[in-house]
């Protein structure tokens, strides 16, 4: 069991690393503090892109895009997996993403991913995933 703290980690780099780990092993991966992951780039552009993605399609036929930060992170990881095939479905079943830290994982040691740290950003432009989901109307 691996517990990853997403606090201050870049969303895409975190997602790609987790996707590789899920496909290569049989270990369950828990991600906590999903709302504190960051998306690099301009605030206005990022919010506009996520709003457009959310509003694409219809309520009847989709595509359906989540509002909550834990679901957005899980959807991002899903996009990096062959989720329509058996090994991708198995990998997704081993992934759990949480907003905050649940009580059963409070005493567990968490790890961080050095390659995904936001201090590696060359620019100071970023927005937290929790703020993006709040702007889209989430009440997490």
UniProtKB/Swiss-Prot annotation:
InterPro entries xref list: Ribosomal_uL13 (IPR005822), Ribosomal_uL13_bac-type (IPR005823), Ribosomal_uL13_CS (IPR023563), Ribosomal_uL13_euk/arc (IPR005755), Ribosomal_uL13_sf (IPR036899)
Keywords, comma-separated and alphabetical: Ribonucleoprotein, Ribosomal protein
GO CC list: cytosolic large ribosomal subunit
SUPFAM superfamilies xrefs: Ribosomal protein L13
Pfam families registered for this protein in UniProt: Ribosomal_L13 (PF00572)
Molecular functions per Gene Ontology: mRNA binding; structural constituent of ribosome
Entries under CDD domains matching the protein: Ribosomal_L13
One Gene Ontology term from the biological process aspect of the record: translation
Family indicated by similarity: Belongs to the universal ribosomal protein uL13 family.
Cited HAMAP family: Ribosomal_uL13
Assembly notes: Part of the 50S ribosomal subunit.
Biological role stated in the UniProt entry: This protein is one of the early assembly proteins of the 50S ribosomal subunit, although it is not seen to bind rRNA by itself. It is important during the early stages of 50S assembly.
Protein name: Large ribosomal subunit protein uL13
Organism per entry: Methanosarcina barkeri (strain Fusaro / DSM 804)
């Amino acid at each position: 069991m691996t517990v990853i703290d997403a606090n201050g980690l870049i969303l895409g780099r975190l997602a790609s690393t987790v996707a590789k780990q899920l496909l290569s092993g049989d270990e369950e991966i828990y991600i906590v503090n999903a709302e504190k992951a960051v998306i690099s780039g301009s605030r206005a552009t990022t919010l506009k892109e996520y709003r457009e993605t959310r509003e694409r399609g219809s309520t009847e036929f989709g595509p359906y895009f989540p509002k909550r930060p834990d679901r957005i992170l899980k959807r991002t990881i899903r996009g990096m997996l062959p989720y329509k095939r058996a090994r991708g479905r198995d990998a997704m079943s081993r992934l759990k993403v949480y907003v905050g830290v649940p009580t059963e994982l409070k005493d567990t040691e968490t790890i961080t991913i050095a390659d995904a740290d936001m201090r590696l950003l060359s620019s100071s432009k970023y927005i937290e995933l929790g703020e993006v989901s709040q702007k889209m109307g989430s009440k997490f």
